[in-house]
C-alpha cells in the first residue's frame, strides 16, 4: 500500500509538471498577442463588452464546451482567415502612417463636425437644461467611428502607438489644454471689439467679438471661455501680410466652460493674431451673465437687460479670456430698439440711428480691465446727474417713478463726496470720465462694482426719506461706500487670482466704515460699529473647525464661487484693521497709496501688498516683516484665544498663552486638518492695567509662542488686566476667574472707566468663551447686569447680538421663561428711561442723535422680543391705529419692530393687512420690512402659505425669497416648517441659487443654524448624504454648527438654568 501510494504521488507530480508547461506556453502565446496594439484593443473591447453585459459573464463562459475543429477543410479556412487578417493589419498600418504624415488627429476630425456648413453645424440657442449638450459642443462624427465617444467624454485620441503609461499632467495639458481649470497662458488678449444686438421682445441677442491676441508660446489650439452661447462662425487671422489661419474646427467643452478652436497650423510665438467669433445666446431669466429683469409702471410691465459677470459669468455673454489676470481694453457697441437706452463702462461716443427704429450706441474704449467687471445694460430708465470737483460725471439711473420721487438723490449726493474722499485718501484720481449707478429690481447681490457702471439692487440704493429709517439709511450708505471703494481696490488694481479675493473685498468692507466716518464723523463707525457688525459676526463663523484660511487655494472651478464668503469679506476687513492699527494709520495710508500707484491698471497678489507696506514702515524707521506676520493670519484658518493669568509671582509677572479657538472642541478632534497641528500666530497684544479709578497707558506685547511670561508694571492684588484694547486685534481674550470678577465689579461700580469699545468687547468675548466651554455659563450673564446703567449704543448692540443665538437655543425649552425673565429684568430700567420715539422726523433722517436713536431702537427690540407687556401693548396700539385710520403714524426707526410684533400678537386680519400693504407700496425700503414682518406670525398655516408664495417670482423677488425662508426658520413657531420646506424644495432652490456665489450658503446657514436637537441633527446628516457633493462646504459648516448646538445643550444648559434659578430668587 505504501509503494502504490508513492507511485501515485509521482504520477500526480508528472501531471502537475505537464499542466505547468502547458500553462507557461499559453502565457507566452498570450504575451505575444498582447504585444500587438490591435490585440490589446480587442482585449479591452472584450472586457468592455463583458462589463456592459453584452459579453458572456464568467459563469456562463465556464459552462460553454469547446468543440475541436481539426479537419483539413477547417485548417485551410483558418489559413485564409489568417492571411486576410494579416492583409488588414498591413492596410491599417498604412492608413495610420498616412494619418501621421498629414497630422490628422481624431479630435480634429470630431471638431470639424462642428463647423458651419458641415455635418453637425451649429444653429439655434443654447439649452437651459444643464444636463443637455450645448449647441456647438463636441458632436459625434459618424465617419470617425469610435473616436467620437472619446471626444464626448473628454478623452481625445492621438496618433501613434498607444503608450503603456498614462500621460503625465504636463503632457495632458499640452494636448488637451481645454481640460485644465486655468487657461494655459499661451495666448493673451490685448483688445476686444464687441458688437451686440439685443432683441428684447424675445429675450435673445446676437454678438460678434473680435479679439486681438498675442501668442506667447506656439500652439495649435485657441482656448478661451464660453458657456451657453451658440457659436456660428470662427475665424483666425494674422496681420495683413499673412492673412487667414485655416481653422480645422471648433467645439465647446462644457466641463471647463471653454471654446476650443483647432487650427490647421501652429500659431507662432511673439506674433499677434485676430480671433473673430459670431454667436448668439439668450437674455436669461436667471441672475447671472446677461439676464433680464422687469418692473411695473402704470399697470404696464417693462423689461430691462443687465449683466452680472463676477466671478466667472462673462463667458455666458461673450467668448472671452474670463480670468482676472487677462486684462485687455474693450470697445463695445450695442444695437437696440430706440425706445431703450444702453449703458456700459464708458460713455457713449456716437449713436447711429436707423430708419427702422433701431439705434447703435458705440462706447469709448476702456482702459486695461478684467472681464468680470465689464458691464452693460439695456433699459428705459431716467436719471439724475451731478459732477465732482475733478470733473467726473456721476449719474443715477432708476425707474422713472423713483427718479421723480427723488429716491436716488441721497445716493447721488454721497457718491460725489465719496469719489472726492477716495481721490484724496489714495492720492490716485478716479480713472474714468464717468460713474453710473444703476438701480435694478432684481439682482443676485446687494451691488456689483463694475468699473464706471455699478449696479445695485433697488433696496440698497433707493431711499425715500418719508418711509426710511436711520438703520435703512445706514445700510444704503455702507453699500455705496463699499462699491465706490472697489473702483480702486478691484477695478484699478485687481487680484491675480481668486485665492486672494479678500484683497478687494476685505479692503472694500473695511472702507465701508472709514468712508462712512468721513460722511458722518459723529457716528464713529470704524471704532465702534465695526466690532459688532464685522468682527463679532465673522468670529462666529471662523470659530468653526470647518472654516478655511482667508487666502485659500482654488483648484477646481467650483472652488471659485466658494471663496466669496464672509471669511474673505469680513475676516479680510478685520485683518486689514488690525494691520492699520499696529502699523499706525498714517503709515498704513501711505503704504496703500504706493500699492495703488505701483499696480494701477494691473494685477497684484498678497505679497505685493506686504512688500509695499513693509517698505512704508521701513521709510518710517520701523523694521517689521509684514509678510512673516500676516502669512500666519491669512494662510491659517481660524484665530487664537489669548489667556492671561495675572500676577502669578511676586514680581508682577503674568503668563500669556495662545491656542486655536474652536466653538465645538469635539469638532476639533474630528477635523483632519487640525489633527497633529500646532497653530501659532504672531499676535500684537495691547494691554492695560487698571483699578476702580485709574487705567494705565497702553502697552503692546508681541506674542509668538504657545506660552510666555511678561513683567507688567502697576500690577497689584486689587488691579485688573485688560487685553486687546478696543478689540483692534483679531483674537479673543480670556482671563482667570479672579480677573473676570474684578472686571465685572468695575463695570457695575463705574463702567465708564472702560471705553465703549472695551465694554462691547468684554460682552462678546464672555458669551463666546462660555459658549465654547472656556468659561462658566454665568460669567456673561453676570456681565450684562451692569447694562441698566449703560447709556451707549455699542455695548447694548453687542449684548443683543450675543443673546440672540442663546435665545434661539433655549426658546423651545420648558423652562425658557426663567431665561426670558432674566433678560427682561436687565432691559426694563433702560426701556422705561428711553421710552418710545415720537414721529417728528420732518423729513430728515440724519440727526445728531444717531447713537441715541439707535440705542432706543435696540432696547425696544429687546423688550418686545422678550415679551415686555408695555412694549407689546404699544406695538398693538400703533398697528390698530394704522388699520383704523389708514394713516401710518408709526415712527420710522421702529416700524419693523412694530410690524413684526403686531403680526405676532394680533389675528389673521392684521397679517392680511400687512400682505396687502406689501403689494401696494412702491417704496423699496417699506416693501422689505413689510415682507419680513409677515414671517413673525404665530399661525403655522400663514407661515406655510408664505413659504409657498416665496417661490413665485411674480410675488416675491428671487433675492427676497431666501430672506423669507430664513426669517421663518428664526421664528420658533416656524423653524420646523422652514426646515421641511427647505428639504422638500431643495432641488428648486439649488437650481435657482446654486451658481450665485454665497446665496446658497446663506440659505443653508440661515435655515439650519438654530436646529439643536439630536433628531434635527440626524435629519441634517441624512439630507446631506442624499445630496452628496452639492454645496458640501456649506453643509459641513451647518452640520458642525448643529453638532455644537446639541453639545452645548447636553453639557451646559442645566448649568445655565441652575444659575438663573438662583439669580432670580435673589
From Swiss-Prot:
Cross-referenced InterPro entries, in alphabetical order? Aminopeptidase_N-like_N, Aminopeptidase_N-like_N_sf, ERAP1-like_C_dom, M1_APN-typ, Peptidase_M1, Peptidase_M1_aminopeptidases, Peptidase_M1_dom, Peptidase_M4/M1_CTD_sf
Q: What class of enzyme is it?
A: hydrolase
Where does the chain bind substrate? Answer: 446-450
- Write down which residues bear the modification named Phosphothreonine: 71
Q: Which residues form a coiled coil?
A: none
Glycosylated residue positions: 131, 202, 217, 264, 380, 647, 676, 691, 705, 726, 842, 948
Q: How is the co-factor bound, per the entry?
A: Binds 1 zinc ion per subunit.
- What GO biological process terms does the UniProt entry carry, in alphabetical order? proteolysis
Compositionally biased region (Basic and acidic residues)? 1-14
Q: How does this polypeptide assemble, per the annotation? A: Homodimer; disulfide-linked.
Q: By what name is this protein known?
A: Thyrotropin-releasing hormone-degrading ectoenzyme
